[in-house]
Amino acid sequence: TQVRSRRLMKELQDIARLSDRFISVELVDESLFDWNVKLHQVDKDSVLWQDMKETNTEFILLNLTFPDNFPFSPPFMRVLSPRLENGYVLDGGAICMELLTPRGWSSAYTVEAVMRQFAASLVKGQGRICRKAGKSKKSFSRKEAEATFKSLVKTHEKYGWVTPPVSDG
């Protein structure tokens, strides 16, 4: 739709103007509706930042696909690499964040704001780069991420979204 296209063009321009190089975007196959987003920064006091330095990981790569009714529905967002553990990143690279669900989404959210929230959630959830032999090399799959996300939304719709206590990170 035109609304989606206009909004995504504006989002791309705004991201290109970011002074802190927090994220960068590459279009997948030149599609305005399928983005690979590089998250270059997380909290520098976090174990995840330490992991990134120790493994020479310059960024966390995510894929965002924007539905026809974006910005009124959220993008589907998943981690592509590196393989992460915890930090609300689940099987297939699915991300457990209420704001990525239809109920939690607001059309006012920008991609930059969503990425900043994701970076904070990764650290809060004590995300780490997976270093287990064999497992760390296995890439996440979209199909697995979609199935996991569908399942987690169902669970949260039934039981609600709980903010973990501060003691949990």
Give the residues covered by each predicted segment:
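UBC/E2-like fold recognition across ubiquitin and ubiquitin-like conjugation systems
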Residues: 1-59, 68-169
